[in-house]
Amino acid sequence: MLTQFSRTELLLGKEAMDRLKNARVAVFVIGGVGGYVCEALVRTGVGAFDLIDDDKVCLTNLNRQIIATRKTVGKYKTEVMKERMLEINPDVKVEIHDCFFLPENAKDFPFEEYDYIVDAVDTVTAKIALVMKAKEMNIPIISSMGAGNKLDASKFEVADIYKTSVCPLAKVMRRELKKRGVKKLKVVYSKEEPIKPVEDMAISCRSNCICPPGAKHKCTERRAIPGSVAFVPSVVGLIIAGEVVKDLVKDC
């Protein structure tokens, strides 16, 4: 009998599909990268998710985020993503956490139940804390490096953090993880030199914030406004999703 996953099963096989159905993946931050991770994984057959993000959909998200439409502006990203995932697969299990991950609230997450962690966070402190928690719990993790201020999606690749170059975020992560004794970390990063945003536009975006009421990360509070396009973070998210699937089923 045909199912919505029949064509995927042609490639992966039944054992792998069963593995994915029984897997629980935590995606930290449901933005330009994380949204496409969720989209690809639910369409591939992953059976359970934890979505972690304290932000709401903003009008400026419409240029790149899969959950962003005129109708979803002002809604929590986790709730919008959950609704979309259930429309794709009504049997998927989705837990949402409308909060931002930090070391002090790590105890609030069921890490012991996660089979894989996706780090799509864009702040160094939270990224490092998440990586350290994953290493402590021996949970596979993949981290997204900088996807903003870039135009060439073909420059992204999968590598160990200590094999990366060019990316400013990866440079900081290498330094901080080395201090903490982390030996390896799978990441997706780009060798493209970051493009400097048009200065007067960045100032305008920050000073004329149109974020929804109650938004936790308003433009007026950001040190820098990164430029973005639809065809870059989406590719990063799809690359990450592919790595998650391949890792989960590699011994099937």
Name what the model sees in each region:
Residues 1-26:
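N-terminal charged helix/coil linker that caps or initiates catalytic domains
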Residues 2, 21, 109-116, 121-126, ...:
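Glycine-rich phosphate/adenylate-binding loop
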Residues 27-29, 52:
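Conserved N-terminal Rossmann-fold NAD(P)-binding element of oxidoreductases
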Residues 33-34:
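Hydrophobic/small residue at the entry helix of a nucleotide-binding pocket
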Residues 46, 51-89:
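Glycine-rich phosphate-binding loop and adjoining beta1-alpha1-beta2 segment
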Residues 57-60, 148-153:
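Short gly/pro/ser/thr-enriched loop/turn and capping motifs at secondary-structure boundaries
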Residues 98-106:
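Conserved SAM/SAH-binding loop
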